[in-house]
Amino acid sequence: MADIQDEAGPFLPPTISPPALLSGVSQTYFSPIPPQLLADNTPCCLGVDEAGRGPVLGPMVYSAFYLPLTLSDPLLKQKHSFDDSKVLTPAVRLSLMKELCTKDTELHDNCGYATSSLSPLSISSGMLKASKAQIYNLNQQAMDATIALIKGIYERGVNVTDIFIDTIGQPAAYQKKLERVFPTAKITVAKKADSLYPVVSAASVVAKVTRDIALEVLWADRTMAWGSGYPSDSKCVSWLKQNMHPVFGWGPECRFSWGTAKDMLETKGGVKVDWPEEEEEETQKLTDFFMAKRDQAEVDVDDLGTWFGAPAGVECF
């Protein structure tokens, strides 16, 4: 995990809400829009990237970053050396994020951003639906988060003309979907876009810092280190083993839909819970209800007849 503290103490960006994190709620944040972008309807470019798609611990964070089209290279690449967040050190990422959040700095006055932090609970509840038809897989969740961020920025009045997005899947298919949703923008979807386009590099930094600090907030009251949160990290696996509750598993930090977590619950002492199928009586048809009422009415009539005596036949006379 990245060290989020510096000489001034811990830094908590506005993209982080500790109460939401600790309660397992997904959260979305939109930064204030630089006034000049709205004043003259400045053409802007926008980049989207994510952090935390693969880990079993912590949120998956999507970030959208925008600024005037003419400033993308000179401000982001040449002056501040934005790059793929994985290439930059934690200290450099944190410094860039702090400047972005500090008033009267060049980044703050010319750039805007938004984040969508999908909580482990939200991710897992979508992926673990009872039927396949109801499953809300990770790709669908990622696509919806991306679209919601871009729409939100458009709705706030930003004149986005060019959109650049990093993708893991097939760029062409992803791009066609987005072009149908945003037909007026020039859209570029590419693998490794975070190292090709400065505006995507900036989005990757915002997403990465937000996720790193989210992990720190989730870990704050714990003593055993959990590493990066990836299933391939031995510290992460050890933490999961040592902190698994046999009934409830783990807290809001864990994605229960990940194979690492599911296998551990099934093979390392987790208590199996059987959920009974719904009985037919609970889904009784309306016609069955009226049939039952009719049968009961016939019984009531018969009972009334015997109360006054059995009917006399011809043979009685």
Curated annotation (Swiss-Prot):
Membrane spanning residue stretches: none
Cross-referenced InterPro entries: RNase_H2_suA, RNase_HII/HIII, RNase_HII/HIII_dom, RNase_HII_hlx-loop-hlx_cap_dom, RNaseH-like_sf, RNaseH_sf
Keyword entries, A-Z: Endonuclease, Hydrolase, Metal-binding, Nuclease
Catalysed reactions listed for this entry: Endonucleolytic cleavage to 5'-phosphomonoester
Family of this protein: Belongs to the RNase HII family. Eukaryotic subfamily.
One Gene Ontology molecular-function label: RNA-DNA hybrid ribonuclease activity
Pfam families according to UniProt: RNase_HII
Protein name listed in UniProt: Ribonuclease H2 subunit A
